[in-house]
Swiss-Prot record:
Function: A cytochrome P450 monooxygenase involved in primary bile acid biosynthesis. Catalyzes the 12alpha-hydroxylation of 7alpha-hydroxy-4-cholesten-3-one, an intermediate metabolite in cholic acid biosynthesis. Controls biliary balance of cholic acid and chenodeoxycholic acid, ultimately regulating the intestinal absorption of dietary lipids. Mechanistically, uses molecular oxygen inserting one oxygen atom into a substrate, and reducing the second into a water molecule, with two electrons provided by NADPH via cytochrome P450 reductase (CPR; NADPH--hemoprotein reductase).
Species, as recorded: Oryctolagus cuniculus (Rabbit)
One cellular component term from this protein's GO annotations in UniProt: endoplasmic reticulum membrane
Obligatory cofactor(s): heme
Regulation: Up-regulated upon treatment with streptozotocin.
Principal subcellular localisation of the protein: endoplasmic reticulum
InterPro entries, A to Z: Cyt_P450, Cyt_P450_CYP7A1-type, Cyt_P450_E_grp-IV, Cyt_P450_sf, Cytochrome_CYP8B1
Pfam families, sorted: p450 (PF00067)
Top-rank taxon: Eukaryota
GO molecular-function term, one example from the UniProt record: heme binding
Name the UniProt record assigns to this protein: 7-alpha-hydroxycholest-4-en-3-one 12-alpha-hydroxylase
Amino acid sequence: MVLWGLLGALLMVMVGWLCLPGLLRQRRPQEPPLDKGSIPWLGHAMTFRKNMLEFLKHMRSKHGDVFTVQLGGQYFTFVMDPVSFGPILKDGQRKLDFVEYAKGLVLKVFGYQSIEGDHRMIHLASTKHLMGHGLEELNKAMLDSLSLVMLGPEGRSPDASRWHEDGLFHFCYGVMFKAGYLSLFGHTSDKRQDLLQAEEIFIKFRRFDLLFPRFVYSLLGPREWREVGRLQQLFHELLSVKHNPEKDGMSNWIGHMLQYLSEQGVAPAMQDKFNFMMLWASQGNTGPASFWALIYLLKHPEAMRAVKEEATRVLGEPRLEAKQSFTVQLSALQHIPVLDSVMEETLRLGAAPTLYRVVQKDILLKMASGQECLLRQGDIVTLFPYLSVHMDPDIHPEPTTFKYDRFLNPNGSRKVDFYKAGQKIHHYTMPWGSGVSICPGRFFALSEMKLFVLLMVQYFDLELVDPNTPVPPIDPRRWGFGTMQPTHDVRIRYRLKPLE
């Protein structure tokens, strides 16, 4: 009994110690409105976690375009005016940090212990190998991998034109993940075994993916924590650098980064964890984004017609003979403005990343309105462009409606002029983040999604099992984690177009 009493007293002291900073914190002059919530230390964490979008809508209506909220003992200052994003993203005073925050996150999620300079190394490797000639080579590898995944090792089979049924999300995610994995991490001489391994990794990845949001928020139960640990260990083994000698065709991008880590003395076991991190970064969003692109095309026949007409005009009539693989003139990916607009509109509606910057020293932020806000050292400045940019009706009229030509000028060129309150705005969409946290692989990600959509509209017949099926809603549990996922899948039928 004495022991339990001592433990209870100790627990009360610990809880009190955790809650004390939140209880004592008060709003200082020039600081944004402070909303600590009614629960000590937790603050608004549970409401935020339940539906981030609705929570931020409520806070903005209550406090305006800038406010600070308490979430699990940490204070986040949300800036909701996109015209005021510039000073935060450029950070000329070097008082806002992203790298240290990211290091803590990747250590928790992937087990990777960052070293000095590796954030810069990733961006340099991406500039060299995911743009220009490097991107051309990777696009070729991706086309080969898509052919392998979608057609099999022998190319088009005699019964390839029979109908298949699947969930569209499962289909898109599976194809994009497996093809992307093989393109980046390499393959062996046994193509069938490569496909089996890619399928195994995809199944495990999807399980980790389902647990991911609650894992990041530390909301897993004991059994789920153990499962996450097992999955992490499994990925470290499956992606181990010890398997590299067995593989051909590892991308120069991955090879460049692993060579750097080796030269810096990073142990092979830590390189395995780096590979897991890069698998997530490269494959966690392209499949879901491809799903949204195809479901919008299926639900908007005028958009589907426009994409097909453009594809035929640029690529010609497709023809896939028996035992052939897909052939696409990859340079055409730079000359398809209609599909570019479709993808940009898809990402506007379906990509919802959160941008974080940790305040290193007190800083005065001047808003576009002229208001000056004092940001406190240790707080986290947060941008959520989905709400403040993508869904702003001033920037994008009818923001919840899919318009395939939203990003096209009347002459068919790309539209880049968007306005808020009559002022031209630089950040009119932000699906890839921005500034130091912009996605370094965005050009390859966009290329592989465009390539997949082109293959689907050119070589396949694709239809909804139920033509009246609506576009499914977004799963609110994933707000803030890159490309969103649907609450449920949608059944489709697909087949290779018959040979004439």
